[in-house]
Amino acid sequence: MSDSVLVYSTDVGRIKEEKASVVRPKGDGVVRIQKQTSGRKGAGVSVITGLDLSDEELKKLAAELKKRCGCGGAVKNGIIEIQGEKRDLLKQLLEQKGFKVKLSGG
């Protein structure tokens, strides 16, 4: 019954629900860059996983990478997606920031 919503309480004042914090699994310290085309009608996307950053830091990093690559992208569930096959450039940019990077997948 942990998913139940409070219906009645004798407490005085407004009762606020606690916000559930997003918990991501800890990685092994290696950032992986994959090429994905499945479900994208053949368009290639570079997917960056393994970054142990907060949501705001991920958004800032994604914005900088998109600007440096000159393309679009998105942040979804702790994963950065950059449009196009820019794996080599992304690897170079992330290594300059001090991340340990591996190219994985196709």
From Swiss-Prot:
**Mind telling me which Pfam families this protein's record contains?**
SUI1
Keyword set for this entry? Answer: Protein biosynthesis, Translation regulation
Tell me yes or no: is Phosphoprotein among this UniProt entry's keywords.
no
Superkingdom per UniProt: Bacteria
Kindly indicate where the leader peptide sits in this chain.
none
- Example GO molecular function term? translation initiation factor activity
NCBIfam families for the chain: PRK09019.1 (NF006536), SUI1_rel (TIGR01158)
Protein family per UniProt: Belongs to the SUI1 family.
Query: Under what name is this protein listed?
Result: Uncharacterized protein HI_1225
Q: Which source organism does the UniProt entry give?
A: Haemophilus influenzae (strain ATCC 51907 / DSM 11121 / KW20 / Rd)
